[in-house]
Structures are given as C-alpha cells and as structure tokens.
Swiss-Prot record:
Protein name as annotated: Zinc finger protein SNAI2
Gene name of this polypeptide: snai2
Main localization category: nucleus
Organism of provenance: Xenopus laevis
Domain of life of the native organism: Eukaryota
Subunit structure of this chain's protein: Interacts (via SNAG domain) with limd1 (via LIM domains), wtip (via LIM domains) and ajuba (via LIM domains). Interacts with elp3.
Tissue expression remark: First expressed on the lateral side of stage 12 embryos. At stage 14, strongly expressed in the lateral neural folds. At stage 16, expressed in pre-migratory neural crest cells. At stage 18, expression is dispersed over the neural plate in a pattern surrounding the rhombomeres. At stage 22, expressed in neural crest derivatives, including the branchial arches and the tissues surrounding the eyes and forebrain. After stage 17, expression is weak in the lateral plate mesoderm, increasing at stage 26, but was down-regulated in the pronephros region at stage 26.
Keywords on record: Developmental protein, DNA-binding, Metal-binding, Nucleus, Repeat, Repressor, Transcription, Transcription regulation, Zinc, Zinc-finger
Compartments it resides in: Nucleus
Amino acid sequence: MPRSFLVKKHFNSAKKPNYGELDNHTVIISPFLYERYPVSVLPQPDIYSSVAYSPITVWTGLLHPPLPSDLSPLSGYPSSLGRVSPPPQSDTSSKDHSGSESPISDEEERLQTKLSDSHAIEAEKFQCSLCSKTYSTFSGLAKHKQLHCDAQSRKSFSCKYCEKEYVSLGALKMHIRTHTLPCVCKICGKAFSRPWLLQGHIRTHTGEKPFSCPHCNRAFADRSNLRAHLQTHSDVKKYQCKNCSKTFSRMSLLHKHEESGCCVAH
C-alpha cells in the first residue's frame, strides 16, 4: 500500500465552506429546461400591441436546445414564462392590411385561364361536321349523326336491287340478304335470308317438331307457329267478323271464315 494513504492529514477549520451562504444563494433555473407546453397569454389591451403572438414554447432538458444570449423576456411579459417566439409574419399575398382579399397574381390568372380553356376544348371536342353541334363523347356524336341530325337523315343508302333506301348501312346489308338469299337448303335447294328460317325449313324434311302445345297434342317445327296456335286456346279473341260478330284468335282464321261465306244470323 502506498505511504500516502497511511499519512494522517489535518484540515484547517478556517477553510471550511460556509454552507449557510450556499443555502441563501438564489439559484436561477432556465425555463428552457422544462417540458414543452403551449402557454396561452392573455395580453391587456392597454399594454400590449395588437400583433398576434404564437403560444410560448418551453423546451425540455432532454433536447438540449442552444441557450440564447439574451435571456431577458420581452417587455410586458412575465419573466417566468421564458422566451417568447417571434410573431408570425402576416400573409400579404392573399389579403392586404385592410383584411380584404388582394387581386390574383398574373401567374395564377394565367393558370386558371389555361385550365378553363382546356376544359372547354375537352367539352367541345367532338363536333358534328354537318350541323356544327358539339358533344363531349364520341358515342353521343355518333348517336346524333344516326338519329337526330337532319342533314344525316337526308343522307340514305339505296339498295342496288330495288328502290328501297335506309338510313344506316347495317340495315341496308340486312335488306340485301332478302335478295341474295345466302342460306340454301341442301335437301331441296330452297334458299332463305336468315339462318333460323333455314333451320325451321329443314325440320319439315326431317319431321322434327320440338315445339309442343301444352293444351293439346299438337306439335310444331317452328316456335312462331306454336305462338300462333296458342292464341286459339286464349279466351281473348280480338278478331271479329263484321257480319256475324263471330270472333277469332288469329287474322288468318278470320280471313278463312270470310272466304268460306259468312252466314249472317237472322
């Protein structure tokens, strides 16, 4: 063990610190060492100015903010509240000093003008070349040309086999099939304009009658013939003979009745 630890040293009592002076000494603690809480200050109207101040900011000691050189608070504020943040600058771009809105800048005005022009161009993008009407969608323009445009309605598609005219090209193509008859029966050579008409005709060769009447035992090769037959079972018979007041379910039955010689009831 070193000898210095074994030597007893005597301390001078005159150099003993005065603990009473330390107790009476005022310790100033910076307000920036406390937690950060916004403290609202209600200024008196006769002391403070009308400039609005933001809430006072108090920093915690964990963040270690740099202490300002001047710790003295602003005039009119209590020193225990700490340093007051500077007042926010007023926004002069949107409002003037009187509180009314200022005119829009040239750049914003040009931007609004450009946006309005683009919306106008987009809204009137599709224009009819015949009557100068504008539409926002192409489908609306196409429907206008086909149905509502007077200039387009006068334009027609003529059939090269007869004198019939049609507004649309699709309707003309469907009509031309009645002249060309592209659906031909392989059994008898009879031609039809529609495939379903040919299918119903082929059943006359095969004897197939898939459509049966639910009220009687009759069956038909075509659905349209079944619908006509069902009218005979209906209670409503809207075709009436003018001579004998007899009613029929179909016009063809009324014609047969008139051709056979109507017996007028006396």
